[in-house]
Amino acid sequence: MKNESLTPNPSPKGEGSKMKNQELRTFISAKPMKNENYSNGEGKIYSSFYILHSSLTHAFLLASICVLTALFIPTPLRATDKIKSGGTWNDTSGSFINAHGGQVIFVNGYYYWFGETRKTSVSCYRSTDLMNWTRLADALSPSGSMTDDNKDIASGRNLERPKVAYNAQTNKWVMFIHWENGSDYGQAKVAVAQSDKVQGPYTLVDVFRPNDHDSRDQTIFVDTDGRAYHFGSTNMNTNMLVTLMSDDYLSPTTTETKILQGDKYEAPTIFKVGDTYFGLFSGCTGWDPNAGRLAYTQDIMGEWKHYYDDMQNYSYGENFCKDEGGYTSYTSQSTYVIKVEGKENAYIYMGDRWNSGNVASSKYVWLPLSVRSGYPAVRWYDAWDLSVFDDMYRYKRAKNITDDGEYLLIERRSDRVLSRKNSFTLENDDTTQNVVWNIIKTDNPYEFKLRQVSSGKFLESVFGTMRLQSESDRTAQRWRFVLQEDGYYRIENAEDGKCFTVSGSSTYVGTTVFLNDPDLKNFRSPAHQLFAVYFDSYKHSEYEEADLFSREYREENRRKIEEFELAMSIEAPKASTMDGQRHDPTVVYDIYGRRIADSLSQPLKQGIYIVGSKKYFK
């Protein structure tokens, strides 16, 4: 029998119900209501009332089935054009996306999303735009049975935080999983599986503890040279273990190190920009969210560093979330950083908003991640799309300061621009508020004058406050730029020594910037007093951009810092003692006493020199 309720209704609005009501009235009027009997052809007699009752009951049951079908069978969804964090996400069939603690990678025109399902399987979804996801078959399904040696992925085991990596030598895809026995978290092992295809199916290879270390929250990172490194929380989450994997990625080598010791980090997420490795982590608070942590290095097996400030405890690293709600990582925990294909330095923070009562129903937090400041910075967006990356890097770090050039100052922790409304504040990129400065050189290579381009007035320290004044020869209009290894500066007034300071060490929009004494009690230059010089690449494409993430950039800055500190501490040596030569008042020496040039008429790099027993700044 054809179910007309599943057939598209071609009638104008309202006509369908009108026609059905008329048909029902006709049906009722055509049937004798009593004293008439009908045979079903098999000798059974039915009254007209019974026939009517049966027909109506049948129609009601069919209608009920249709309603239930509509409620429980997913309906294909319209295409999604925005990413909305913290909500319920469905795939293209209308089913809830279940892929937690996972990863997204780009392969041959598609993004593949892997995640745990809490059903001893690893799900896999596919998309071309990171917004509309199609469910594929499980990448990894339960296999084997629970055995004493725990070498299985049988139903009932816990498989968490799946990550996959392609091995170019074997032409195989390898999956890494945090493996537990299903009853507790005491096993702390790694399961490794392998497949010929990125989407699977993956087959279990082994379950082990890396070199007999416990390993819980984990990830895999493949470097540009093809080497794979496994990161896992170890020593009951006290330290982070980094293990170099074998050439086929299937087993650990004995090359290992423990990083961030004592910091109690979990949920590791590792990615690389240039020569710099970044790690995003969380603290250990169970299913509850906490402030994200940031660490970095240029030697993956060496020392990992993080910045602190006086507002944070030593067990906390720098938080990569910059807006309100960042103290809980926007109610999420890190799981991966997605590289957006076809866009330079475009990354997405990928996090889980856990529901401990029903982990499978946990939600997702995906947000744009910027590295413009030289460090990962994640801001909150209610809804966004990939166009957010179009202007993300409009302001670029200046390699050099050109005399009288036009620049902006960006604060390190917030990745926000020094701006001016009624006072100096930190704001998002906004050409109507961001202050553009002419940075004007003086006779001291470390001191500059700052002229606001729009008003032509100069920044001056007036009774310890930041004021824009007409130009003068006052020392209070000179600003010393004290360089840091990462290219940031402590900007301090040449007269009173007070420096740019962020109120309350806040990273929020609208935070006040004021002058305060350098906070050097525990740190040479704390993070909340550091700014870097940027330029508007839309207006000044001729300016040269600094290579923030290269080894050479930091090495050159360290050299400049050494030169600056030496210059500030030494007295000019007597020229007669230099290089054993007879005194010549025109010869140019560097601060180490090495002969550089015969006279100042020769080209010299910026720096400090000794000429005729006197310091010369260029």
What does each model-identified segment do?
Residues 21-46, 50-53, 57, 562-618:
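C-terminal outer-membrane/trafficking sorting elements
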Residues 59-71:
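Bacterial N-terminal signal peptides
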Residues 92, 430-431, 599:
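Coil residues (strongly favoring Ser/Thr
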Residues 101, 108-109, 168-170, 224-225, ...:
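Residue-level signal for tight coil/turn positions that link beta-strands
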Residues 396-549:
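Lectin-like carbohydrate-binding module/patch detector with strong preference for beta-trefoil
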